[in-house]
Structures are given as structure tokens and as C-alpha cells.
Amino acid sequence: ISKRVIEWFRTKPSVISGLRDNDFSRYTKEILHTRTDYKDEILDFISSMDVGFREVTTEQEYIDEKMLPKGLPAEIVASLKEHPPIVAYAKHSKINADGEVVGIVDFDIEERESDGTRKLFNLAGPIVDTLRQGKSLFVDELDAQLHPLLSRRIVKLFNYAETNPHGAQLIFTTHDTNMLSKKLLRRDQVVFVEKTAKTSYSTKLTPMMSITLDNGAKPRTDSNYGKNYLEGKYGAIPYFEDEFKDCNE
């Protein structure tokens, strides 16, 4: 059994840091550049997130060895020549003073788009691939740099059979209490994480379904999960020695 578990984790999941998702920029660019069967799905995902563009083109850069820094290790030079960088361009409409479309302008996504748009682009490849293959995707800090409604939309893609026919799984961490909604997540999908003590580096995981409230009951399905969490009913919140008054007091 242990060998099967290890093999599953080795072959199935992808792991992404929501704060350092640039590592997956190349992944998305390469799929767009080489996999025509993925391109439409990735562009549909990007377009559905209301980022302001629908089309993306890619271009593989030419590596001139003479332009590389002197003394660069030979293995790095060889890697750059074998896998030259790919640049992705978002096609934006050019609008005149009368609000009319008068042309198209290309934006280098890495250079000219916002942090949130770049993150969505970087996540697009792994998300589409995960949904197509029925794999598991781990994203740390999913909500970082994203509007709350965009984070929720990504979660919904995994919640419905229409968009997730192969049973792919999204496992993510977040500090956004907007995610704690009965309209988005069931109780058995939520786990709270907290340090066991101020001086301890260990972490305690508490599934919402295992929590017992002060009245001896379990969290109700019609509860306001986010409000109850911030009120400390589920634990896993910071505690302060002093407290500031609310602005309306």
C-alpha cells in the first residue's frame, strides 16, 4: 500500500506556490506554443476570468551565444540553446478617444500585465492540464494577488462535473474567509490549520467536521462559516494580548 501511495504522489499531483507561481509561467507558455489541443481550453479559461484579452500568441526567442554573459557555465548555455525562452503576448484592443477599436496591440504578459493577470496566466496551464487528466493540484496561497471572486471561480471549476468530468482535485491554502461559504465548500472540504503552541513549529490540522462547538453541536450546514471562524468558534485564529476598539465604537 505504501508503495502505491508514494507512486501516486510522485506521478499525480502538481504543487504550486501562489506567491512564486512564475515557475509555472514556462509550463503554460510551452503548452500554448506546442500543444494546439490545449490552446483553446487555456484561452477559454483566461477569457472567462475577465482579464481584458482573449487571444495570446507565443514566440520562441533566438539565443545568440555571443550576447550571453561571458563566463556562463557551458551547461547553462547548452540548456538555453536546447530550451530557448518563450515569450507570451496578450492581444489588447487599441481604443481611440471615441471608444472605437482602431487596432490591436501586443503586451508582453510578463512585462506589462498586472501581478494578478500574470498569476492567472501562470496557473492556466496547470489548471487546464489537471482538469483534463483528472489529477490533483496543490496551490499554496491560492488567493494571493487574486480578486476574491476570481479565487472562488477557480474553486468552482473543480466543484462541478460539467467543468471537472474526470474528478480532478484542487487542494489549496488561503487566508481569504470569503472562501468559507456554504455556497462554495461543504463542511467536509474544509480543514483549519494552526500552530500547536507559540513556541512550537508543529502544525495542527482540524477538519471542520470534527469540530465540536461550545454547545456540544457540530457546525451546521446553514451556518455562516466565515463569520463563525472570525469569531473564534472554529479555532485556528491569531490571539492578541491587547485589542483595538472597532472604528464605530
Language-model features, listed with the residues they occupy:
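C-terminal lobe/lid and adjacent interdomain/linker elements of RecA-like ASCE P-loop ATPase modules
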Residues: 153-249
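Short basic/glycine-enriched coil/helix segment immediately N-terminal to the Walker B
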Residues: 127-135
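Catalytic core segments in nucleotide and nucleic-acid processing enzymes
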Residues: 116-117, 148, 154
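Phosphate-coordinating catalytic segments in nucleotide- and nucleic-acid-processing enzymes
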Residues: 1-124, 225-228, 239-249
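Short, contiguous acidic/charged loop-to-helix segments that flank catalytic cores in large enzymes
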Residues: 109-112, 145, 161, 180
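Conserved D-loop-proximal element of ABC-family nucleotide-binding domains
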Residues: 132, 144-148
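Walker B catalytic acidic pair
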Residues: 140-142
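Contiguous, well-ordered alpha-helical segments that form the cores/surfaces of helical PPI scaffolds
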Residues: 121-128, 156-157
